[in-house]
From Swiss-Prot:
Coiled coil feature spans: none
Annotated compartments: Membrane
Biased composition (Basic and acidic residues): 638-651
Similarity comment text for this entry: Belongs to the transient receptor potential (TRP) ion channel family.
Protein name: Uncharacterized membrane protein C663.14c
Length: 687
């Protein structure tokens, strides 16, 4: 029995000792700080570096470094390494490389390459100088300054009064950052879900009547416009011309793709070739960008790593040059515009195929198939409207660089095209209003419901109230003034942040006073995005002033939390809108989203009232004001002739529908209620 007890205690003691050892081992710190971006901080240096890597490991208390360079002098050298964190010097190491057996620099020889790899031991006292927060905080604000001096100069005076032979500066990275591919994927998914949800409900609304399409579009939010403006706001916060905390630039870079800042090695090589053939200066100090660990050359005029300023800092974080930003934006804008147009064309071809094969009714979606070019025009112009702030901003910013004439010419042509489109649009609408007699102030709603206007220009004011359609010009003025300040005042951070805040305040006040957007949910999204812009640029004002780096980081984190919460809310709302759209469209699921059910019930009720008593006044019908105000009727004065289920004008102008019985529209008796369109006696507004 005693032997059994002794054996039991022996086994138990071994288990406890092994567990204790594992616990002690797991509690040992295993932190790491390593260099990321680097650049030379001295021009015309006798010793130049092509590579500088350094990593500090807390477990073995050592710094491992790797240096590649070239020497043009003979000298005995002394290394000086300074570690800075959050604006303060935390550690300094001055030593003779011969003491740690760095033979290639002991001494350095003229016209020889330097290849040095070494391990520098660190004392526990030096480790205590580095704050513990450095090991876990995202986007650690740290720098390493590496200099080489002549040993004779240091012996004759002091190291601070000596002239270095070489100088490098590199940022420190602890492996934690707000720059994350998951956030990029989530932002792209949220934008795609918002588009898919709106388009899905748009088609569902056409299954019942074109009368419902505008109401459905406004109630299925957030839309492309809402989500696009929010993503642009977050991305632009990283492009303000202030010395920004690294954490804010890293966060903004997740959304830089909405600005067209998407690049890879092949695109960069093509852009460099384009700039080279248009007298581009590759060593211009305005180019921006610094080198990472896989770089093989260093530009002495690049921005100092760790100091992120305006578009240069955002370009560095994205991995491109500032002179390439406009060209990247233009390339991806044209690609996205082609994708939007291709989706519309493919959809029209699918509808035609389904009609030819009689899978759907012969007259289903007649408006889309007959007037596909108007649908295509509305879709493309809606995307141009979303991209307008980005395009104007990058055009004006390209003018400030003046580094190569090729991108400047492209920017000038695009600016002329955009403003030509704006002027043509204004002249066209004014001419239609004048010639059609729609300028009567007693009945401004006819502008909204006139087929000569909204079938072409509905993308401008689709979500605006009838009496507030001119608010779209206030939006253009807002975008243009924002672009001017953001692009032209990059070198005056304090003035820029204050002006941007004033612009957003004025825009928000106009929005609150006029309340131009129709529908509660639509207005809520607009107000939420506008308020986010105001708060974002308000928080950037103190960062523009001479605050210490730690208060700047705290303000930046508060801004990230606010923007992150708003983005998460809008993304979840887009997901819910998409899910409810799928549930409504799926035949096996007998579910209809409540607001759509109310719209359909109201439409059916008004159909019944109009069928029993066509002379009943519209004011006696049940109001749908809680969902969206009714559109006013517009009856074309000319006589019409019936062609199937479509009313066309007898004078041969078949590009305009007559809106007889436009509100509500009676379903055609020969077409089932589940078809895409019930006869199209009413002209729909297209996106």
């Amino acid at each position: 029995m005693k032997l059994i007890l002794l054996a039991y205690f022996a086994v138990l003691s071994n288990i406890l000792s092994s567990v204790e050892g594992r616990v002690r081992y797991s509690k040992r710190p295993n932190h790491k700080l390593g260099t990321a971006e680097y650049a030379e901080c001295m021009s015309n240096a006798p010793i130049v570096f092509n590579r500088f890597d350094a990593s500090y490991y807390t477990r073995n208390l050592s710094v491992v470094f790797n240096i590649l360079g070239y020497s043009s002098v003979d000298a005995n050298v002394t290394f000086d390494i300074i570690v800075e964190a959050y604006g303060e010097q935390r550690a300094r190491f001055t030593f003779d490389p011969c003491e740690i057996n760095l033979n290639t620099v002991c001494p350095v020889a003229r016209d020889t390459a330097i290849t040095t790899q070494g391990i520098l031991p660190v004392s526990p006292q030096d480790v205590q100088m580095i704050p513990k927060i450095a090991w876990g905080i995202p986007d650690f604000e740290g720098l390493v300054r590496f200099r080489m001096y002549r040993s004779e100069d240091i012996a004759a005076s002091s190291i601070d009064n000596s002239t270095p032979l070489a100088c490098m500066i590199a940022t420190l990275n602890n492996g934690h950052t707000f720059k994350n591919k998951v956030v990029k994927a989530l932002s792209g998914t949220a934008l795609a879900l918002s588009i898919a949800g709106v388009l899905g409900f748009y088609v569902i609304g056409m299954e019942h009547s074109t009368y419902l399409t505008r109401q459905v579009f406004i109630n299925s939010v957030p839309s492309l416009q809402h989500m696009g403006e929010l993503l642009q706001c977050i991305a632009f916060t990283g492009a303000i011309g202030i010395t920004q905390p690294k954490v804010l630039v890293a966060w903004a870079s997740n959304f830089a793709w909405i600005l067209g800042f998407i690049t890879n090695k092949e695109i960069e090589n093509s852009l460099e070739s384009f700039r080279k053939h248009s007298n581009g200066n590759l060593s211009s100090p305005k180019i921006g960008g610094v080198h990472r660990r896989d770089a093989v050359a260093t530009n002495p005029q690049s921005p100092i790593p760790g100091f992120y300023h305006g578009f240069q800092g955002l370009a560095t974080e994205v991995g491109t040059l500032t002179t390439n930003l406009f060209t990247l934006t233009l390339i991806w804008f044209l690609i996205s515009l082609a994708i939007a147009g291709g989706i519309v064309i493919i959809f029209v071809l699918i509808i035609k195929f389904l009609r030819q094969t009689r899978i759907i009714a012969k007259s289903s979606c007649d408006y889309i198939t007959r007037y596909w070019f108007r649908v295509l025009f509305n879709a493309c112009m809606r995307w141009v409207l979303v991209c307008w702030p980005v395009l104007v901003t990058m055009i004006i910013y390209q003018f400030t660089l003046r580094e190569a004439y090729g991108p400047v010419i492209l920017a000038a042509l695009l600016l002329a095209l955009l403003f030509g489109l704006f002027l043509w649009l204004t002249i066209k609408v004014i001419r239609v209003i004048t010639t059609s007699g729609l300028s009567n102030e007693d009945n401004p709603e006819t502008l909204i419901s006139d087929p000569k206007i909204y079938t072409w220009w509905g993308w401008l004011y689709l979500d605006l109230k009838e009496r507030r359609w001119l608010y779209v010009y206030a939006c253009f003025a807002h975008y243009f003034s924002f672009a001017l300040v953001l692009a032209l005042v990059q070198q005056f951070a304090k003035i820029q942040t204050i002006l941007l805040f004033v612009i957003e305040i004025i825009s928000f006040i106009l929005l609150a006073v006029f309340r131009p957007f129709v529908g509660f949910k639509n207005s809520f999204c607009v107000f939420l995005v506008a308020l986010t812009r105001v708060v974002s640029f308000a928080l950037l004002i103190p960062i523009a002033f001479d605050l210490a780096i730690i208060p700047k980081v705290i303000i930046a984190i508060i801004l990230i939390i606010i923007q992150g919460l708003v983005f998460s809310f809008m993304a979840l709302w887009s997901l819910w809108n998409f899910i409810t759209m799928l549930g409504t469209a799926w035949p096996a699921i007998s579910y209809t989203v409540p607001w759509l059910r109310r719209l359909i019930d109201e439409y059916q009720r008004q159909l019944h009232i109009d069928f029993e008593n066509p002379a009943v006044s519209a004011s006696e019908k049940l109001s749908t004001e809680e969902i969206i105000p009714q559109e006013s009727n517009f009856e074309e004065p000319s006589t019409t002739k019936k062609e199937g289920n479509v009313d066309t004008k007898e004078d041969g102008n078949d590009d305009v529908f007559s809106l007889v019985n436009a509100s509500p529209m009676r379903p055609a008796s020969t077409i089932p209620s589940h078809s895409c369109d019930n006869g199209i006696n009413e002209m729909q507004r297209t996106v």
